[in-house]
Every structure is written in C-alpha cells, then in structure tokens.
Amino acid sequence: MIGNWNYGTGRRKSSVARVFIKKGSGQITVNGKPVEQYFGRQTSIMIVKQPLFLTNNVEAFDIKVNVHGGGESGQAGAVRHGVTRALIDYDAALKSELSRAGFVTRDAREVERKKVGLHGARRRKQFSKR
C-alpha cells in the first residue's frame, strides 16, 4: 500500500492514527467509512481538515486513516496530527506553514491519574470542621 502513498502517524491523548495520503479527489475515509459518517460532530470533521485548508489542499488528496483508542475528540486530534505529518512527508516545504499554525507539535496533555484517598486526580473529600 505504501507505493505512491505518503504516510504519517498521529497521536493525541490515548488515540493513535495511521494516515496515508496520495494525490486524488479529496475523499477521506476513516476506518473504512467516510469521515462525515465516522465523526458525528461537525467540529471533529473540521479539526481533521484543518491542515488541508491551511495548505489549500482540500480536494487535492485522497486520505485513508486507521485510528484506534480514545474518544472522538482525541481521535480527531490524532488524525489531524497524522495528516500534518503525511503532508510534510509529501512536501517538506509545507512544514514551516503547518508549524506556525501549531499542527506539527504533538499535544502532550494526558489524563492525570486518580490518587489514593481522593475522589479523582485532585478532588479531595469534603472537609468537616465538626
């Protein structure tokens, strides 16, 4: 499959996306489904297409994505990161433009773990004076 395809791996929260792009008509498939069908929310679809809009390549590439782990928001962010890396693999001149927009940098924020004796990561038990 890697013949004339360009590849990029994207990660966000606990999601991992493998993105393959090649010159085409602008079709985006995520796990075998059209992007509009896979991501229900319009904001998630917009996040996925952001690097394409920025580089004026909305209908220039066919994109195939395998994504797993996490929820809808994390998966959309992972796909955006993967599309960005695949575009850089296709044309390194796009890197500065994508980097200025902040798409090249991996968002390192993860869920903080729950601690013993607390309700959540930071939420303490209610204090009673008496």
Swiss-Prot record:
InterPro entries in alphabetical order: Ribosomal_Su5_D2-typ_SF (IPR020568), Ribosomal_uS9 (IPR000754), Ribosomal_uS9_bac/plastid (IPR023035), Ribosomal_uS9_CS (IPR020574), Ribsml_uS5_D2-typ_fold_subgr (IPR014721)
One cellular component term from this protein's GO annotations in UniProt: cytosolic small ribosomal subunit
Protein name according to UniProt: Small ribosomal subunit protein uS9
This protein's record includes keyword Ribonucleoprotein: yes
Gene from which this protein is expressed: rpsI
GO terms, biological process: translation
Pfam families in the cross-refs: Ribosomal_S9
Keyword entries, A-Z: Ribonucleoprotein, Ribosomal protein
Top-rank taxon: Bacteria
GO molecular function, one term: structural constituent of ribosome
Family: Belongs to the universal ribosomal protein uS9 family.
Lineage of source species: Bacteria, Pseudomonadati, Pseudomonadota, Betaproteobacteria, Burkholderiales
Spans traversing the lipid bilayer: none
PANTHER family associated with the record: RIBOSOMAL PROTEIN S9, SMALL RIBOSOMAL SUBUNIT PROTEIN US9M
